[in-house]
């Protein structure tokens, strides 16, 4: 479990199925869980503060980790320990899908089919960052980014068109399957 409070940014040393990340942590253990841009991964190999993680097909399909390039930044958070404070919300690291950034800056607007399961003022994890949903509309949602979030996380540098990992808060998401009616669907249908 995680909180969505990013501890630091890491740098991709080697992309791919055996993802290598410079974490800045020298005290990680083999088998430890780390959220990498919101995705719960298990430490497979350590060399100083460089860590390797194995990515399976489902991870590559559901997340943006397969699109990472050498030198890219990722958000990092270590797993909760008993007695830690819960400053964000409970995050499993089980990304449900991705969204596309359509507006960035002090607010972030993301298009995704998962919006149908969201509620305003509910929590969401975007690339591992715990955020409060400001607004929900068909096929999209908006969150506000405070200065510390823009400074510490990758969201302060995210560009329009980028894919971001999304995990809905299990306590506030709406039940049911997301609607397949998106802006693109409506546009193609002539609306």
Predicted regions and their residues:
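Conserved loop->alpha-helix
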Residues: 1-191
């Amino acid at each position: 479990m995680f909180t969505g409070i990013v501890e630091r940014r890491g740098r991709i040393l080697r992309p791919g199925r055996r993802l290598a990340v410079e974490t800045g942590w020298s005290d990680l253990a083999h088998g430890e869980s780390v959220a990498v841009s919101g995705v719960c991964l298990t430490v497979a190999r350590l060399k100083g503060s460089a860590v390797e993680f194995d990515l399976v097909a489902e991870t590559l399909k559901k997340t943006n980790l397969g699109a990472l390039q050498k030198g890219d930044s990722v958000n990092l958070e270590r797993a909760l320990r008993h007695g830690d404070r819960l400053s964000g919300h409970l995050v499993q690291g089980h990304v449900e899908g991705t969204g596309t950034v359509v507006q960035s800056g002090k607010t972030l607007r993301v298009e995704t089919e998962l919006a149908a399961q969201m509620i305003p003022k509910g929590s969401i994890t975007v690339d591992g960052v715990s955020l409060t949903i400001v607004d929900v509309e068909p096929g999209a949602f908006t969150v506000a980014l405070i200065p510390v979030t823009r400074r510490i996380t990758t969201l302060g540098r995210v560009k329009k068109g980028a894919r971001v990992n999304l995990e809905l808060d299990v306590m506030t998401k709406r039940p049911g399957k997301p609607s397949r009616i998106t802006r693109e669907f409506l546009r193609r249908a002539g609306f």
